[in-house]
C-alpha cells in the first residue's frame, strides 16, 4: 500500500511540475419527442449535457467524459420519492493514457472501439451498448467499462490487448418505458444464476497495413452482454405437488468470438467489412440447478421436484459490409449490409405441460422451443432486432464543412410481415452546424 502511494505521488508531482495543456468540448441539447398519432410525449432518457476534458502532459493524457442524463418525472413521482432531481450524472469515461516508444497503455473507465465499419460491427463487442441510445452513432450508444488496454506498434503491424475483471452488460429499456423495442421477458434479480468466480473478460487483436488498406484479426472471451433462458425448476411444499410453482432461471452464457476485418481503398471508393464467429455455451449444469433454492417464497416452496437445465451450446455468425463513394456535387454515399444467422444449436428440452403458465414470457408453451427464443448475447447492436438489414446514407457539407446535412434509412429486409413492397424502415434527417 505504501509503495502504491509513493508511485501515485511521483506521478502527480511530475504532472504538476511539467508543462501541460487542456482541451474541452461538449454540447448542451434540448429536445422534444412525441407521438404523431396523438401528440403524447415519449418519455425516454436523453443526454441533456456532455463535457469532454482532456489533460495532456508530455507522454501522459487523462481523458474524461461527463454527461447529464435527463428524464421527465412521472406525475406520481412524489408519491413515493421525495427527491426533486430529474437527472442523473454519468461519468462515461475517465482513464489514464500513457504513450511510450513502443505503443500506448490505457487504464480506467474506457469506451473501447473495435472493428472497421463505421457502425454495427459484430467485432465491436468490448464495450456494452446503451439501448436507449441505439439509434445514435459512434461511442454515443456505448458504455464505458473499468478495464485496461495495451497497443503495440511495430512497422506495419499493430497488436492490442484488453482486460476487465468485471462482467459488463448492456443497458436495456425497462418494461414500463416508452421505448418501442421490448424484450421478450423482464426477469427479477433473484431469478438469475450467479456467475462463479471472477467473471474475467479479455481480448486481443492484430492488424497489418497494406498498400490498399489493412486487415485485422480479433479474439474475445467473456460472458454475454444479454441474459438468456438457462432452464426451469419446479418446486412444491414438501412432497405435496398439488400446489407447485415454476421457477424460470436466467443466466449469462460464456462466449468466445473470433473475428476478421478489412479496409480497402480503391480510387474514390472505400470498402470495409467485419465478420465474426461466436461460440457460446451455458455453463450451468444439473448440480447448480439442484443446489438452487426457489426464487419465490423459498421457505414455503422448499422441495425441488423437477429440474430442466437447457445447457445451450450455440455457434452463430454475424457480418457487416460497408461501401462508401463520393457522388457528384460532393455528396458522400454510404451503404451497409448486415446479416446474422445461427450455424449450430444444441440444448436439452423443456418438457412442460400445456396447462402450466409461464409468467413474463409473451409466448405459448407450444412456441417454447429453446432454439426459437435464442438471442445472441454478443455482436452488433442491431443483432437482437433483425437478422438482415440495410443502411443507406447520403451526406452533404457546405459553408466550408460548417453546415452538414445527413439523410439515413434503416431497412429491415428480414421482415416478411409487410403488405407492400417496402419492408420495415426507419428514416432520419440530421443537420448540424459548427
Predicted regions and their residues:
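Transmembrane beta-strands of outer-membrane beta-barrel proteins
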Residues: 22-30, 60-64, 105, 159-161, ...
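Transmembrane beta-strands of outer-membrane beta-barrel pores
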Residues: 30-36, 57-59, 68-72, 100-102, ...
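Extracellular loop and loop/strand-boundary signature of outer-membrane beta-barrel proteins
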Residues: 36-39, 78-84, 132-136, 188-192, ...
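Outer-membrane beta-barrel translocator domains and adjoining extracellular loop/strand segments
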Residues: 36-44, 74-80, 87, 118-124, ...
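Residues that define the transmembrane beta-barrel architecture of outer-membrane proteins
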Residues: 41-49, 87-92, 99, 142-146, ...
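Residues on the lipid-exposed face of transmembrane beta-strands in outer-membrane beta-barrel proteins
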Residues: 49-55, 93-100, 148-152, 204-208, ...
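Outer membrane beta-barrel
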Residues: 54-178, 211
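Solvent-exposed loop segments that connect transmembrane elements
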Residues: 177-187, 229-250, 283-311, 345-379
Amino acid at each position: 500500500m505504501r509503495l502504491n502511494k509513493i508511485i501515485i505521488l511521483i506521478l502527480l508531482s511530475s504532472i504538476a511540475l511539467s508543462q501541460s495543456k487542456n482541451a474541452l468540448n461538449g454540447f448542451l441539447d434540448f429536445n422534444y419527442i412525441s407521438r404523431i398519432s396523438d401528440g403524447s410525449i415519449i418519455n425516454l432518457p436523453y443526454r441533456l449535457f456532455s463535457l469532454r476534458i482532456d489533460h495532456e502532459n508530455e507522454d501522459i493524457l487523462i481523458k474524461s467524459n461527463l454527461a447529464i442524463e435527463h428524464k421527465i418525472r412521472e406525475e406520481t413521482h412524489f408519491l413515493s420519492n421525495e427527491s426533486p432531481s430529474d437527472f442523473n450524472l454519468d461519468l462515461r469515461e475517465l482513464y489514464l493514457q500513457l504513450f511510450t516508444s513502443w505503443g500506448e497503455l490505457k487504464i480506467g473507465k474506457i469506451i473501447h472501439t473495435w472493428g472497421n465499419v463505421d457502425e454495427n460491427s459484430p467485432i465491436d463487442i468490448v464495450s456494452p451498448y446503451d439501448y436507449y441510445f441505439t439509434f445514435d452513432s459512434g461511442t454515443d450508444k456505448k458504455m464505458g467499462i473499468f478495464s485496461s488496454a495495451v497497443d503495440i506498434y511495430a512497422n506495419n503491424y499493430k497488436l492490442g490487448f484488453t482486460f476487465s475483471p468485471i462482467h459488463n452488460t448492456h443497458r436495456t429499456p425497462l418494461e414500463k418505458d416508452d421505448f418501442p423495442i421490448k424484450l421478450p421477458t423482464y426477469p427479477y434479480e433473484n431469478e438469475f444464476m450467479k456467475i462463479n468466480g471472477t467473471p474475467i473478460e479479455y481480448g486481443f487483436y492484430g492488424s497489418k497495413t497494406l498498400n490498399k488498406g489493412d486487415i485485422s484479426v480479433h479474439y474475445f472471451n467473456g460472458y454475454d452482454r444479454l441474459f438468456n433462458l438457462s432452464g426451469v425448476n419446479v418446486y412444491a411444499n414438501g412432497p405435496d405437488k398439488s400446489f407447485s410453482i415454476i421457477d424460470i432461471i436466467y443466466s449469462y452464457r460464456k462466449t468466445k468470438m473470433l473475428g476478421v476485418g478489412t479496409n480497402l481503398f480503391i480510387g474514390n471508393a472505400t470498402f470495409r467489412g467485419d465478420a465474426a464467429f461466436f461460440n457460446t455455451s451455458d455453463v450451468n449444469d444439473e448440480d447448480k440447478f439442484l443446489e438452487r433454492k426457489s426464487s419465490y417464497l423459498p421457505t414455503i416452496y422448499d422441495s425441488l421436484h423437477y429440474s430442466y437445465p437447457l445447457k445451450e451450446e450455440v455457434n452463430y455468425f454475424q457480418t457487416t459490409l460497408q461501401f462508401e463513394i463520393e457522388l457528384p456535387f460532393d455528396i458522400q454515399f454510404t451503404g451497409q449490409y448486415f446479416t446474422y444467422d445461427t450455424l449450430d444449436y444444441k440444448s436439452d428440452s423443456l418438457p412442460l405441460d400445456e396447462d402450466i403458465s409461464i409468467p413474463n414470457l409473451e409466448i405459448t408453451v407450444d412456441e417454447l422451443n429453446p432454439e426459437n427464443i435464442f438471442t445472441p448475447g454478443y455482436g452488433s447492436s442491431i443483432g437482437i432486432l433483425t437478422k438482415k438489414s440495410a443502411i443507406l446514407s447520403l451526406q452533404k457539407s457546405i459553408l466550408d464543412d460548417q453546415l452538414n446535412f445527413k439523410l439515413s434509412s434503416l431497412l429491415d429486409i428480414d421482415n416478411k410481415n409487410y403488405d407492400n413492397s417496402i419492408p420495415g424502415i426507419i428514416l432520419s434527417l440530421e443537420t448540424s452546424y459548427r
